[in-house]
Structures are given as structure tokens and as C-alpha cells.
Amino acid sequence: MGVTQVIIGVPKEICPGEERVALTPANVGALLKKNGVEIRIERGAGEAAGFTDGDYENAGAKLTDRDDIFSNAQAILQVQTPGSNTTNGQEDLDKLKAGQFLIGMTDPLANAQFAQALAERKVTGLALELIPRITRAQSMDVLSSMAMIAGYKCVLLAANASHRMFPMNMTAAGTMNASRVFVMGAGVAGLQACATAKRLGAIVEAYDVRPAAREQILSVGAKPVELDLDTGEAEGSGGYAKAQGEDFLKRQRELMKEVIKEMDVVITTAAVPGAKSPILVTEEMVKAMKPGSVIVDLAAERGGNCDLTKAGETVVENGVLIIGPTNVPSSVPFHAS
């Protein structure tokens, strides 16, 4: 048996509502194949995601407590580091020691103070959100993988809240028309939302400010909505949409109003890294929608794409339900982990 050179520690997540775990039993086994690696898991770390302490022990990990991990691990893996856990992450930050590596989601663009705090403690932080969207880093691209899960789950939230069934059905009483679903933003989350809504039988349309998104929308069976706007420079690095000026957004909202008033479900997914989410759906636009319609705002944590969104709440305005879910991937913790 080789000499232990690196101890990797996985503490239980303490961020409220976080049910994911940073390392699954299957990946414990993969890491232990490397010489000199020891893995310590806090007892109960994987329970909320469906992984028992026994699963970790069988994979070769050692069960321990939180203090042992922060005292002795050279590398600490967390889903929500103190940078993204602003509720009670300070207690973990205070436990970190010089020379340690902290790997996880740190929200560095919105929380620069955390990066400074790590530097002062001589702790090296790896912000998984900043890993570029390239082939070599694909297995560590947490933004894309979590966005895929969020796009899937937001459609289920919409279907559950809607007064209508998604698919067309022929019944003895007559024909029930399929629901019309409109997805705003055709990134990873938006495309997955399109695909999921299509599988449920809805008529799906989608819009993205990036011209290149048209083919992607078609590839998942949705119909691209095209607006009379100049979008030549709408795409930034890494394939993400660039923030647009207020004049552009105002014109976009005027044109979009005519589209969404016909929809049964609207899903918004537009987010700008490190910045407040752009307002795509105004209160006036909501009032033009049919009673019983549903809006699911996946950008709720960054202020929301809808004027009326309240993070973590469901608001009813003029008979329209506006759902502002937060940390959606955590609601599917097994696969998200």
C-alpha cells in the first residue's frame, strides 16, 4: 500500500437547501486508483443525494467529521464554497488553513471579497464556474451540466403549475389542443427546456439574441422566433450572449409582447455572468398574457428576467403564475452530484 501524499476531503454541504454532494462513491473509486490519494468524507455528506455512508466506505473512502477534514485535508471539495454560500459559509471560511486547495462553485464574479479572503489566508481556490467551455475541460464544465438539469426541471415545474395539459389529446368530449411553450434564451438550459417540453407534447418556440442559436433551436424540435433586431454582435466569448444596451432591450420587449401574449408557458433563462439578469418580461407584458399562464424564471437568483419575479417564491399577477425557483439543480441531487 502506498504512502498517503494527498488527502482529499468532502464536507457535508451546509448551504440552506443544498442537497448535492461534491463527490459521488463512483468517483471515489476512480480517484483512489491514483497512488498516494486518501479520501475522507464527512458522515452524512451524501445522504440528501441518495448516497449512504456505506456506499462511500465500500468505495474506499474514510468517514470522519467536519473538523478533521478542514484540519487535515490538502484539497477540499464543496458544491457551494463559502463564496457562493453567503448565508452561513463564513464558518467554513474561518476553518481554512494556509496551503489548502478549495475546489467548487465560488461565485467569484459577484463575490470578489471571497477571493480576497482566500488570498489573505493563502488558500488556493478553483472556481469551477470559470472553467472555459472547451473540449479538454468538458468533464469539469459545471455550468453546462447544471444548466442542463435546470432546463429539464423548470419544464416540470411549469407543467405541474399549468392549468393545461402539455400534449394534444383526443377525447370523447373533444380535442384538447397542445400547450404553447415559449423559451427565452437558447443556451444549455434553454435548449434542454425546449427538448423536455417537446417530449411532453407541447408546441415549443424559442428565441435567443445570438444568430447562431437558430440552428440549435431547430435541432431540438422547437421553432425559432425571429425579431426585427440587429443582433450581429450579440455573442461573446465561449458562446455566451453579451449584455445588451437598454435601447436594444426596450425594442426587444416591444416585439416580444406580441409573442408571449399567445403563450401558455413562458420559460426565461437569460443570465449574464457576474451581473444582474436582464429584464425581458415587463409587468405590462404579464398583464397581456392569458389567465392561467405560467412563467418560470430560471434567472431568479440574479434578479430575474421578469419584472415581477421574487426569488424562491411563486407570485400571481392578473391570473398569471410567476415562479422564481432558486438552486434548481439541487432538486435533482442524485444526477446533479
Which residues make up each language-model segment?
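Generic hydrophobic/aromatic pocket-lining and core-packing "Φ" positions
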Residues: 28, 53, 115, 155, ...
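An N-terminal-biased, well-structured beta-alpha scaffold segment characteristic
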Residues: 4-117, 121
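Adenosine-phosphate binding glycine-rich loop
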Residues: 129-171, 300, 305-337
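Short glycine/serine/threonine-rich phosphate/pyrophosphate-binding segments
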Residues: 85-86, 189-196, 207, 214-215, ...
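A structured beta-alpha segment of the ubiquitous adenosine-cofactor-binding alpha/beta core
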Residues: 60-74, 82, 234-266, 270-283, ...
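Rossmann-fold NAD(P)-binding glycine/threonine-rich loop
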Residues: 107-135, 275-328
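Glycine-rich phosphate/diphosphate-binding loop of Rossmann-like nucleotide-binding domains
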Residues: 11-48, 167-261
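Residue-level detector of alpha-helix initiation sites
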Residues: 109, 149, 187-188
